[in-house]
Amino acid sequence: AMSGEAEGKPAIPGVLMADMNASMAAGMSIMIALRHAQMTGEGQEIDINLYNVAMTLMPGAASLYFGSGFVAQRGNNWLTGQNPNYNIYETKDGRYMSVGCLEKKFWSNLCAALERTDLTELIEDSSQYDYIKEQLTIAFKKRTMREWEEYLVGKDTCVTPVLNFDEACAAPQ
């Protein structure tokens, strides 16, 4: 239950991640087993289950848990909304922009684009995260999603609109 807002209910992911990745794991395992049989004449047993596959899709949470006992939950780590520079912000028209500025250059570029260079160094202090999120929430509400998309072209910010499926299919890549 790591997806969704910290104070809300878990989000339904909208994609069968474990199932799809189990299929890929099965395909790779079958190819390896066939190659092994070709080389040695021996067969292989393949054992794949959705639980184990799902756990492999959360390496950050697993490394934190098994390394330090930290339990990742909604909103308490960088992948689930704790960090202001890796988050989603609502725009003026009720759409959303996804911010993925984990690298300092992208964060600096975003702060410059927002004309909020005062936030650039604050990101180093986790006690300032709530303040920075508030400031980004205010900033992103000033334009529509499309206005942000156009405004940020060429600014190298690692910020992108959250698109509907049809928009994503039509987006140039």
Walk through the language-model features, giving the residues of each:
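Active-site-adjacent "lid/gating" segments in soluble enzymes
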Residues: A1-M97, C101
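Short C-terminal domain-edge/linker segments immediately following a structured domain
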Residues: M2-G8, N77-Q82, L119-E121, S127-I132, ...
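Compositionally biased, intrinsically disordered/low-complexity regions enriched for serine, proline
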Residues: E7-P10, C158, C169
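Residues that form or immediately flank small-molecule/cofactor binding pockets and catalytic motifs
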Residues: V53-M55, N164-E167
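Aromatic-enriched alpha-helical interface/lid elements that frame and gate functional surfaces
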Residues: N85-V159, D166
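Active-site-adjacent capping/gating segments
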Residues: E167-Q173
